[in-house]
Amino acid sequence: ALFLAAGFDDQLVLDDDVALLVIPHEVGSQGHIIVKTMINDHGPNRFALDTGASISVVFDKTPEEAGLELLAGEQVLVHGMIGSGHFPLTTVAELKVGKESWRSGRLASLPGNSWVPTEIEGILGVDFLSRYAVGVSAQDRVVRLYPPELVSNRSYSGWHSIPMRKLQIGRGTAFAYSINLHINKIAIPAILDLGAGFNLMNWRAARAIEVMPKGAMSRKIIYGAVEDARVVAELDVKNLGVENLHWSHRLFYISKFLIFEVLDLENKPAAIVGPAFFKDRDFVIDFVRNRLLIRAGT
């Protein structure tokens, strides 16, 4: 059976049998969730999962090594967490993650002028990830790709369901996804960004929750796919809530991040949460129902 009964007709246990793919992942030095891919039978290539990227990306030498050709005269505007730019497109005959195949995918080709490409060869963005419900297990160190229509039609025992909101990126058709954090009775939209190795916050959010940040203890740099940014302050949030879940001691870095402007959040309290926010909790992103499933603590 794909599911195990859990005592209620409408509540089922999400187990490995329903996953289309279970693949090991590693955590990069910047907190990225990295899996191995094959491009046109070339690889393995190290790609990071990134729900903050609307389009998948290949870096630097990967197109040349994989025999990819840039599409003449075609460019795409890529919005990163820190910067934006226009970059050429390439078409991949087949991109494989484990046994899951994506054919004729269009990827942006970015130069390797950031520190990020020294650790990864590319990014799997929402254009690939939204074809599935995506599960990440910190304890098992695996990524699970589930059939999206099956997961969206179920509720699961032992998982909390958190609503996600779709935020339009610029004037295009791409979207980012956010959840609401509650800190000191203030609701703060937080972009769910698997490509963010750290939790981030703008100054307006720090002021709204009336917690005094301290100057950055180090000259830490946040490395983005397009540009980099230096952390100017950091904030330890001792208590916060996400729906009916409560969390303690989450570190947020503060700087100027372009993505807040792109999402029309530059004049509002806003944050970004990456995989580090969940620590040892497993989670599943259900794009169809716009919800985040978080495994209950033990």
Language model regions located:
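Pepsin/retropepsin-fold aspartyl endopeptidases
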Residues: 1-298
